[in-house]
A protein has these predicted regions:
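Internal gly/pro-rich beta-alpha loop/helix module
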Residues: 82-191
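Glycine-rich phosphate/diphosphate-binding loop of Rossmann-like nucleotide-binding domains
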Residues: 197-233
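Helical hairpin unit composed of two closely spaced alpha helices linked by a short loop
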Residues: 234, 238-241, 278, 284
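Switch II (G3) loop of P-loop NTPases
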Residues: 15, 39-54
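Inter-motif core of Ras-like GTPase G domains
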Residues: 55-78
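Cysteine-nucleophile active-site neighborhood
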Residues: 248-290
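Conserved nucleotide-sensing/catalytic segment adjacent to the nucleotide-binding pocket
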Residues: 13-29
């Protein structure tokens, strides 16, 4: 798919909140702008709660503190039980700038297993909100930079199955109650530009790692058109061509076989065309990929 799993699950394009790339004020403004009209805002963390580029700088915990939202932990309970008590206690008390309101356990073997985990929650002072059982029908293999979801994967059926499981074992109503906060973000409306540039962005199964806000900024600078290095035969006329990251290495035969697109890109670059390429997009511009 050309969309992320978070987009598919929500039915709405997600946005990145990144305190390394953006200022604290901009992070708050993004949250306010995109979240104001929503019934529920879910901030999906990355790696561990406190993992950042320098200590907890840039971490999910820092973002939670910046925008003032509570934290629900998702904790792997595989091959453990009461030992989660000190782990939970540490999460709750390690940093006073965030508020841990509950936990959902993953990889729970049985109802009896969950009972041990609930006792640990009581003693650690963290509310147990439910669990996800061990179930092969809701497993997605992981790979570098995310989950392994290809064009053969039926996400709608998978999401329905996950919802069915969660409805039975997670107290969603209580989770939403604990996470209800006053929405206090201020929207600035962003920067308004009236540029007349034409910007072509590569977007298909091979190239789809891009920040939504970057695309919106390009739209304010001019007209944005999308094209597919996999399927299109020619490059759109453009003042700038943007090749975002993705997984071109998974589509090498198709990309290599699209001679018309390859030659069009080469000619554009060699005649002084402006190009922005990131990660997989930069790989595509190389002579070879090994």
């Amino acid at each position: 798919p050309t969309r992320r799993s978070s987009d598919l699950a929500a039915g709405e394009e997600s946005v990145n909140l990144d305190s390394y790339m953006a200022s604290a004020a901009h992070v708050r403004e993004l949250y306010a702008r995109y979240g104001a009209a929503s019934d529920v805002c879910v901030m999906e963390g990355v790696m561990g709660l406190f993992d950042g580029y320098d200590g907890m700088k840039g971490s999910s915990a820092e973002i939670a503190e910046l925008i003032g939202i509570p934290v629900v932990l998702v904790l792997n309970a595989k091959s453990t039980a009461y030992t989660v008590a000190p782990v939970l206690y540490g999460f709750k008390h390690f940093y006073p700038g965030i508020r841990v309101v509950g936990v959902v356990f993953n990889f729970v073997a049985s109802v009896a297993h969950y009972a041990y985990l609930q006792q640990a929650c009581v003693d650690a002072g963290v509310e147990a909100l439910g669990y996800i059982p061990k179930d092969e029908s809701i497993v997605i293999p992981s790979r570098h930079l995310g989950l392994s979801i290809d064009e053969t994967f039926c996400f709608d059926a998978f999401a329905d199955r996950v919802a069915e499981v969660i409805d039975k074992t997670v107290n969603v109503d209580r989770l939403l109650e604990l996470c209800t906060v006053e929405f206090s973000g201020e929207q600035t409306g962003g920067v308004i530009c009236s540029g007349n540039r034409k910007i072509a962005i590569a977007r298909d199964e091979a190239f789809n790692f891009m920040y939504r806000e970057n695309v919106e900024a390009l739209k304010r600078a001019g007209e944005v058109v999308f094209f597919s290095p996999l399927h299109d035969k020619r490059l759109p006329d453009a003042d700038l061509v943007y090749f975002p990251g993705g997984y071109p290495e998974l589509h090498l035969p198709e990309l290599a076989a699209n001679e018309g697109m390859r030659q069009a890109v080469r000619k554009y670059c060699e005649t002084g065309g402006r190009v922005l390429a990131e990660c997989g997009g930069m790989m595509y511009l190389c002579d070879t990929i090994t």
